[in-house]
Swiss-Prot record:
Keywords: Membrane, Transmembrane, Transmembrane helix. It comes from Bos taurus (Bovine). The keyword Cytoplasm does not apply. The keyword Membrane applies. May activate NF-kappa-B signaling pathways. This is Transmembrane protein 101. The gene is TMEM101. It is found in: Membrane. Its main location: membrane. It is a multi-pass membrane protein.
């Protein structure tokens, strides 16, 4: 019995570490995909989301926070810094208005950003630490869970009100309209769990199972989004990387919630 308990705990710790790796490395992929995206835009004489002088500071801050989080040095503080950096850069891009996206794409982009910020707040609370020396901050974790709940509300909303998102699910998942409605209900129920703070671990476990097929079949079909929906290639790659980061946050809450 003791050996079974020990092996189960070891497996949970291993999965939790995997979630931490995926989430803490997310800013690296975000910076790389942004650089590639803005390089493509420069060839077409189009501006980046953030003016160039500030863009370098923004990416430098993101890489700095991600590096310290990855090495586990003051992870809580730098996770909080990463959340703040992402919030400021997203606000600057939104206010700047250099690039105009469709409403449905804005929801996809900003909802994922909100979820990643929530994941960093969960990490800043002390969740996902293998050897926790300080008590966990329940207020930070609750705030992060609310951000993840807001993301799920946006996804559920898009399934009902965005033609592009509905068609993506209809074209890539079996079951047709019934499957779309099933995902809508699942996203709604999971959102309620995260927003209310009840059954968070169970909700995170369900979300961790739900996200991989969605990432592989829908977000992972880059050619579909680029050719059919005119989403820039590296923008879709950035969204895919953020989905992986959200999966990492769900894994952390599922194993250490």
């Amino acid at each position: 019995m003791a050996s079974k308990t020990g092996s189960r705990r070891w497996m949970l710790q291993l999965i939790m570490q995997l979630g931490s790796v995926l989430l803490t490395r997310c800013p690296f992929w975000g910076c790389f995909s942004q650089l590639m995206l803005y390089a493509e835009r420069a060839e077409a004489r189009r501006k980046p989301d953030i003016p160039v002088p500030y863009l370098y500071f923004d990416m430098g801050a993101a890489v700095l926070c991600a590096s310290f989080m990855s090495f586990g040095v003051k992870r809580r503080w730098f996770a909080l810094g990463a959340a703040l950096q992402l919030a400021i850069s997203t606000y600057a891009a939104y206010v700047g208005g250099y690039v105009h996206y469709g409403d449905w794409l804005k929801v996809r982009m900003y909802s994922r950003t909100v979820a990643i910020i929530g994941g960093f707040l969960v990490l800043a609370s002390g969740a996902g630490e293998l050897y926790r020396r300080k008590p966990r901050s329940r207020s930070l974790q609750s705030t992060g869970q609310v951000f993840l709940g807001v993301y799920l509300v946006c996804v559920a909303y898009s399934l009902q009100h965005s033609k592009e998102d509905r068609l993506a699910y209809l074209n890539h998942l079996p079951g047709g309209e019934l499957m779309v409605q099933l995902f809508f209900v699942l996203y709604g129920v999971l959102a309620l769990a995260f927003l209310s703070g009840y059954y968070v671990t169970l909700a995170a476990q369900i979300l961790a199972v739900l996200l991989p097929p969605v990432m592989l079949l829908i977000d992972g079909n880059v050619a579909y989004w680029h050719n059919t929906r005119r989403v820039e290639f590296w923008n879709q790659m950035k969204l895919l990387g953020e989905s992986v980061g959200i999966f990492g946050a769900a894994v952390i809450l599922a194993t250490d919630g």
